Each structure stands twice: as C-alpha cells, then as structure tokens.
UniProtKB/Swiss-Prot annotation:
The chain crosses the membrane at residues 29-49, 58-78, 103-123, 137-157, 201-221, 242-262, 276-296. GO terms for molecular function: G protein-coupled receptor activity; olfactory receptor activity. Residues 50-57, 124-136, 222-241, 297-315 are cytoplasmic. The lineage of its organism: Eukaryota, Metazoa, Chordata, Craniata, Vertebrata. Disulfide bonds join 100-193. Potential odorant receptor. It holds the Pfam family 7tm_4. The keyword Ribosomal protein does not apply. This is Olfactory receptor 5P59. The gene is Or5p59. It is found in: Cell membrane. Residues 1-28, 79-102, 158-200, 263-275 are extracellular. It is a multi-pass membrane protein. Keywords: Cell membrane, Disulfide bond, G-protein coupled receptor, Glycoprotein, Membrane, Olfaction, Receptor, Sensory transduction, Transducer, Transmembrane, Transmembrane helix. Gene3D superfamilies: Rhodopsin 7-helix transmembrane proteins. It comes from Mus musculus.
Length: 315
C-alpha cells in the first residue's frame, strides 16, 4: 500500500524510484557495469584498509586517515548501489517511507564525513610539509583519533538535522514517484505537499557550511604548502612534497567538483538526467577511483604491496 489515510490527509507510505532509465536493454548493460564497479570498489578499498593494517611502514597519520577514507568510500557506495542494482532488475522499484529516510540520512552522513576527512588529510599534509620537525608531536595518535572522531560527529550532526528535523516533518500526500535512483533531498522536497521553503533554506545552509568550512581548511592548508614548496632549494625535496600532495588534491578536486555541480550550481542550468549521471559519478565512480588515485602515485603503498605479495609468495 503506497498511501495511508490519516485524518484529512493521505500519507505516502512508500516511494517509487524511477531509476536511471526505462530501456530494458540499457538496464541490463548498466546493471553489469555498475555491479562490476561496486565489486571493484569494495575489493579495492578493503585491500587498502588491510594493507595499511598489516604493513608497519604504513602506520603513519596519512595512512590512518586514508584507511578511514576507504571505509567511508565503501559506505557511500553501499548506501545507494545495492538498491540501484535491484532497481535495474525490477520493473517497479519501491522503497518504504522509513527506508527512504534511512537512505537519505546514511548517504548524507557518509558524504559529510568524507568532507571532514579530506580536510583533516589536508591539515596532515600541511603539518608534514610546513612543520616537519613538529609533525610527530602535532599529529600524534591522540590528535589523529580526535580528528577522525570529530569527522564522524560532524557528519552525524549534519545528517541528523536533515533526516530527523526535516525529512520526518515533511508531509507527503500526493505523487510518490522519485525521479532518481535513490532518495535525495531535492526530489523529495519537490514531492512534499507541505511548505518546505524554510527547510530547504536551512538544509542548504547546513550542507553549504560543511562544504565551505572544509574547503576553507583545504585551501588554506595547500596555500601554505605551495608557498613552502616554492621556497625549497632542493629539487628532490620539491618533487617529494608535490608527490605526497598530488593524490589528495586529485581526490579533493573530483569530490568537490561533483558536489558543486549537484548542490551549488542553479538547478535550471542542467537537466534531471544530467544530475543523475553526476550523482552516479559522485556516489559510485569516485569511491572506486580513490584507491587507484592514492596507490598509483604513492611509492610507499606500492612498496608495501610488493612486500606483502612477496611474503605470500615465499610462504
């Protein structure tokens, strides 16, 4: 039952996810591609986590943050990809009202945590390049744990605001067809028959605050890093400093670039289908790419992987 009579209102009890396409052939093709991407995402990020855990030479703050980023990437992909895959197999994919709220909250929680983690990683790079003598003191285990815990708390608070205060206060009494492959705030706000203008404003402010604060930390950190690198006289030192920052800058550019497209640019400037494609890149592709970005340009990770594979071969 999709609707429930409640006094003078008809409340929606489930939503229909329209997904990416109605074309049966294209659905099969997309199912195969996205399933492969998801499996690579889980395998790649789990491998990163395990490699960091078992390799003593990777027991440094940068890799501590990277292991949590890998966990978050598995989470953000898992929050939407399984339901998307089911959507490809069914002619009519539905999600309950409660399930929609949980999916919205989990996706927002994990996305917010990733923003804070990327900012923490930028600060870690700043300390490593600009204050190498104080690095071990300033980036102690206690400080790293506090930054990670703070990232999760910040993500939880942001998600709680969106889900608890606003989603469950929305009244859905009309159409229940979401033109997306997951429960996102914008299409849900369009379906609500209650006044959501204030809610949209506050949620935009909340999401914008997370983005602006973390971007500010990243920009300031890399501004100081760039100044420090330009002052270096050693070519080898410059190359090493650049190499340690390149992978993180690439990940930051991809992540915040898609966030800007989805949540900052005016909705009139792109279609719903374009929004879906960018959302797939943001929630499905980037979690798969991050392990490749961080491992291909990192000699320590490649060295640790070779040592572990060598040990397995010898044993």
């Amino acid at each position: 039952m999709a609707f429930l009579q409640d006094g003078n209102h008809t409340a929606v009890t489930e939503f229909i996810l329209l997904g990416l396409t109605d074309d049966p052939v294209l659905r099969v093709v997309l199912f195969t591609i996205i399933l492969c991407i998801y499996l690579v995402t889980v395998f790649g990020n789990l491998s990163t986590i395990l490699l960091i855990r078992v390799s003593s030479q990777l027991h440094h703050p940068m890799y501590f943050f990277l292991s949590h980023l890998a966990s978050v990437d598995i989470g953000i992909s898992s929050s939407v990809t399984p339901s998307m895959l089911v959507n490809f197999l069914l002619e009519r994919s539905t999600i309950s009202y409660l399930g929609c709220g949980i999916q919205l909250g989990s996706a927002d929680f994990i996305a917010s945590v990733e923003c804070f983690l990327l900012a923490a990683m930028a600060y870690d790079r700043f300390m490593a390049v600009c204050n190498p003598l104080l690095y071990s003191t300033k980036m102690s285990t206690q400080v790293c744990v506090q930054l990670v815990v703070g990232s999760y708390i910040g993500g939880f608070l942001n998600a709680s605001l969106i889900v608890t205060v606003y989603f469950f206060s929305f009244l859905f009494c009309g159409p229940n067809r979401i033109d997306h492959f997951f429960c996102d705030f914008a299409p849900l706000a369009e379906l609500s028959c209650s006044d959501v203008s204030v809610s949209v404003l506050i949620i935009s402010f909340s999401a914008g605050s997370v983005t602006m604060i973390t971007v500010f930390v990243i920009v300031i950190s890399y501004s100081y890093i760039l100044i420090t690198i330009l002052k270096m006289h050693s070519t080898e030192g410059r190359h090493k400093a650049f190499s340690t920052c390149t992978s993180h800058l690439t990940a930051v550019t991809l992540y915040y670039g898609t966030i800007t497209f989805i949540y900052v640019m005016p909705k009139s400037s792109f279609s719903t289908d374009q929004n879906k494609v960018v959302s797939v890149f943001y929630m499905v592709m980037i979690p798969m790419l991050n392990p490749l970005i961080y491992s291909l340009s990192n000699n320590e990770i490649k060295g640790a992987l070779k040592r572990q594979l060598g040990m397995k071969t010898l044993s």
